[in-house]
Regions:
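Hydrophobic/small/kink-forming positions within alpha-helical transmembrane segments
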Residues: 69, 73-77, 176-184
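Substrate-agnostic recognition of the 12-TM MFS/MFS-like secondary transporter fold
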Residues: 51-52, 57, 125-183
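Short, Lys/Arg-rich, polar N-terminal cytosolic tail immediately upstream
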Residues: 1-13, 223
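A membrane-interface helix-boundary motif in multi-pass transporters
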Residues: 89-94, 187-203
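Hydrophobic core of transmembrane alpha-helices in multi-pass small-molecule transporters
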Residues: 18-28, 37-39, 101, 113-144
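Symmetry-related core transmembrane helices of the 12-TM Major Facilitator Superfamily/SLC fold
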Residues: 96-101, 196-212
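C-terminal ends and interior cores of transmembrane alpha-helices
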Residues: 99-114, 213-216
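Helix-to-loop junctions at the C-terminal end of transmembrane segments
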Residues: 75-88, 190-191
Length: 252
């Protein structure tokens, strides 16, 4: 089977995955504490809150949570398009966008209860984050939530006994550990800095963006920073993103 990982080399992919998962956990904890238990990246929790709000007739609360879910979905949508169109600049572009959005929320107006405008940039960034990296099957790595990671770890343990687990099995437990550790750090940062703690997550995203920008310039086309993967979660026969980009920009 063709390896559709992005980046192709685990030397950069795994550390990036763990750092970004930690960043997501940190941002989610800050948002949860700052915005009345509203999740920034845990859409399962927000979906439960939406259902409970509808059942109780709390329409402002239901609209608030539904709008966050919609923005997160928009982030995944936009991130996937960026991944497909940015070519070899995929990682730098996505990470710089995420860093900018994590800062932007601090300057946004709060908005009315049903539409928390200052929350949307953070949620958009975390939705976009899930299109940043891919596993060997071309699936987007779930960096901002761990339900899938826990399930894959459990099924991987069973497959370890039955025959051989998938290659992606080994990263699931570290991803859970990174996200939960990030949540602890986010809780501590919020205690001392309040909403301004988002600046720490933005700084981490910017640091990673700078690192991959330098690597892209120094080693263009290297497995450390590139790959032949199609867009995240694309069909098995989809062309690699660089080929997609060339076709789309070729004269008709």
């Amino acid at each position: 089977m063709t390896d559709k990982s992005f980046p192709a080399s685990a030397i950069t992919r795994v550390p990036l995955a763990l750092l970004l998962s930690g960043l997501a956990g940190c941002a989610d904890a800050i948002g949860f504490l700052e915005f009345s238990q509203l999740f920034m990246s845990f859409m399962s929790g927000n979906t439960t809150r939406f259902g409970a709000a509808v059942a109780q007739g709390e329409w402002d609360g239901a609209t608030r949570v539904a709008s966050v879910i919609a923005v997160f979905c928009l982030g995944a949508f936009a991130g996937t398009l960026v991944a497909a169109w940015a070519g070899r600049w995929r990682l730098p572009v996505l990470l710089w966008l995420q860093a900018s959005l994590l800062c932007l929320g601090l300057g946004m107006p709060e908005g009315p209860v049903p539409f928390p405008f200052h929350v949307y940039p953070v949620v958009l960034a975390l939705g976009m984050q899930n299109a940043t990296l891919q596993d060997a099957d071309g699936r987007s790595l779930a960096l901002t939530y761990v339900t899938g990671a826990v399930v894959r770890f459990g099924t991987g343990l069973a497959n370890l006994l039955l025959h051989k687990p998938a290659d992606s099995f080994w990263i699931q437990a570290p991803l859970w550990g990174a996200l939960s550790s990030g949540a602890v750090v986010g809780g501590v940062l919020h205690h001392y800095f309040g909403e301004a703690a988002f600046l720490f997550t933005a700084a981490l995203a910017a640091g990673l963006a700078l690192a991959v920008t330098v690597l892209t310039l120094a080693k263009p086309g290297s497995r450390l920073i590139a790959g032949t993967a199609p867009a995240p979660d694309a069909p098995a026969d989809a062309a690699p993103v660089t080929v997609v980009r060339e076709r789309a920009t070729a004269p008709s």
